[in-house]
């Protein structure tokens, strides 16, 4: 029942230099963020990565979960990491791997990636006993070529989501019209 198994990808050689982009995506969310917002944001990021690869470039994608023990922005920016800081980076797609949208979508758009996977890491590391409510969303240490920061607000319109993808592609110098 998986239509993706019927797709065969044909790779073609291109005569222009391929760029490799490192995308660091924070999956730190405030407890007030709805699952709908997480899913929409993940879909936007998946669309961006798909467009980069469609244009003939490569993407390395890293999920980042950074949390601070304290709520103030000073601590959430990583200024006093020895006071209470947990950060986990998971490479979910290496640049030389083909794009597997199902795996990418789970890691970037499914609330369980944070709530089950990352929270279980926090429990194993003892962080959940140290910080209240698993801590507060914080800024990643390593930001790559694109850093998609933690979320504190709600949904955006579909038009705004499309504009965001196009703006990010433009910042990277990725032109879809030549592909």
Label the predicted regions.
Residues 1-20:
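Negatively charged sequence features
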Residues 1-3, 37, 56:
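Proteins with a high burden of low-complexity, intrinsically disordered sequence enriched in S/T/G/P/A and R
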Residues 16-41:
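MIDAS-like acidic motif and immediate structural context at the N-terminus
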Residues 29-35, 43, 50-179:
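Acidic, glycine-rich A-domain
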């Amino acid at each position: 029942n998986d239509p993706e198994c019927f797709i065969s990808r044909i790779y073609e050689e291109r005569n222009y230099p391929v760029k490799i982009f490192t995308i660091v995506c924070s999956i730190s969310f405030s407890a007030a963020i709805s699952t709908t917002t997480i899913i929409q944001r993940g879909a936007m990021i998946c669309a961006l990565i798909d467009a980069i690869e469609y244009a003939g470039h490569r993407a390395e994608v890293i999920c980042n979960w950074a949390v601070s023990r304290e709520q103030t922005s000073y601590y959430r920016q990583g200024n006093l990491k020895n006071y209470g800081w947990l950060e986990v980076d998971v490479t979910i797609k290496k640049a030389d791997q083909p794009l597997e949208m199902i795996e990418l979508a789970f890691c970037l758009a499914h609330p369980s990636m944070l709530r089950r996977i990352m929270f279980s890491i926090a429990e194993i590391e003892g962080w959940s006993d140290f910080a209240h409510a698993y801590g507060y969303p914080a800024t990643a240490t390593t930001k790559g070529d694109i850093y998609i920061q933690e979320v504190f607000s709600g949904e955006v319109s579909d038009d705004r989501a499309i504009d965001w993808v196009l703006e990010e592609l433009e910042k990277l110098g990725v032109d879809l019209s030549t592909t």
